[in-house]
Structure formats: C-alpha cells, structure tokens
C-alpha cells in the first residue's frame, strides 16, 4: 500500500510588466517611488484572492491592477495576444509558446498551493493511496465498495476548460501511474477517461 498523496502546484506569473508590479510591492510608505498607472491582467483562478489583496495594497501608491480570474489557459492566450499586460498560469509557458511573444516573457513563481480531491460520501472516511487515486480517475475503480466503503457509485467531476490545476493534477497522475502517463498524459486540457467536465 502506498502512502496517501498530496499534490503541490506552483503558480507562475507571466509578463513583462510583472517586474514593475513586483518592484512596487516592495516599496514602503517612505519611498519616493513615482511609479503609477494601471495594469491589466488575466489568468489562473487559484491565486486570484492573494493577487487581489496584493493589488489592493498597491492602490494607495497609485498603481491599479485589473486582474480577471479566467483560468490559466485563457490568461496565457490573452497575454500572448497582447490584450493584457501580464498573465498568471499554474503551468509555465513552453519555449515554443514563449517564441510567439515578440515583446518577451518573464516567468516568475509567485505562490504555491495544494490540490485536494474532494468526495461526497458521508458514510465513508477515505485516505486514498496513489493507486486508488489513479484508479478512480482512470475509471477502473467505479464504486466506493472497492475502497472499503458501503456500495455507492463514484461520480467523477473534473475541469472542462484549459486549467493550470488540471495540468498539475494530471502531471501528478502521470508521475504515479504509468497507465495514466501512457494513455492520458499531462496538460491543461486532456481527454479524461471517465467523469464529466465542469467549470
């Protein structure tokens, strides 16, 4: 039996304007900084709350940031298209994607978090092993009885859009399951072998 799992994901802030906002974050009340203006940004939903807090701390210094929590995939697309100053993604941009951005790309790790698998069965207390986790998402484990609980069908719900969380989760599944790695792989959007997609 393998140990219960924990998945950690790092979130990357992508953009040429990120340096400007980070420099402003480090200024103090006594700073003579004359940096001011408005930045537009879009991307990952996971870090949106901490970004909003950081950006509200910048507002009294004259720096406004409009961050739209639209998901990692949309954030990268908007940044690549030049419609936002910077984007945020749970998955770093690949070199071939970076090459498409003529103004350049700076990728900065901003924060980290864990991905949890939630379940809705009050009659069962689970600590999933890696084999059980991959079996559930591969569709080979279909019933709670296979996990030592009373019989009840397992209904899987996963992200349907391009998601950095999906990338990190499927990267973990690829690391713990050769079957997952060979048949599904890791990306922001994958062909899930089971379950229904939702946003």
Predicted regions located by residue number:
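C-terminal motif of bacterial Sec signal peptides marking the signal peptidase cleavage site
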Residues: 20-24
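Bacterial N-terminal signal peptides that target proteins for export
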Residues: 1-13
């Amino acid at each position: 039996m393998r140990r219960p799992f924990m998945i950690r994901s790092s979130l990357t802030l992508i953009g040429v304007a990120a340096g400007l906002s980070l420099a402003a974050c480090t200024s103090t009340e006594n700073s003579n900084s004359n940096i001011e203006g408005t930045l537009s940004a879009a991307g990952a939903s996971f870090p949106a709350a901490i970004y909003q807090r950081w950006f509200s701390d910048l507002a009294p210094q004259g720096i406004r940031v409009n961050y739209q929590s639209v998901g990692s995939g949309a954030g990268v697309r908007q940044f690549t298209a030049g419609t936002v100053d910077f984007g945020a993604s749970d998955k770093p941009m690949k070199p071939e994607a970076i090459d498409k951005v003529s103004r350049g790309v700076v990728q900065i790790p901003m924060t980290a978090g864990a991905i949890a698998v939630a379940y809705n069965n009050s009659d069962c207390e689970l600590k999933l092993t890696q084999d059980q986790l991959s079996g559930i998402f591969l569709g080979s484990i279909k019933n709670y009885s296979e996990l030592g609980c009373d019989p009840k069908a397992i209904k899987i719900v996963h992200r349907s859009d391009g998601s950095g969380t999906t990338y990190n989760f499927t990267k973990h599944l690829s690391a713990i399951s050769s079957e997952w790695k060979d048949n599904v792989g890791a990306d922001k959007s994958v062909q899930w072998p089971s379950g229904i997609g939702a946003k």
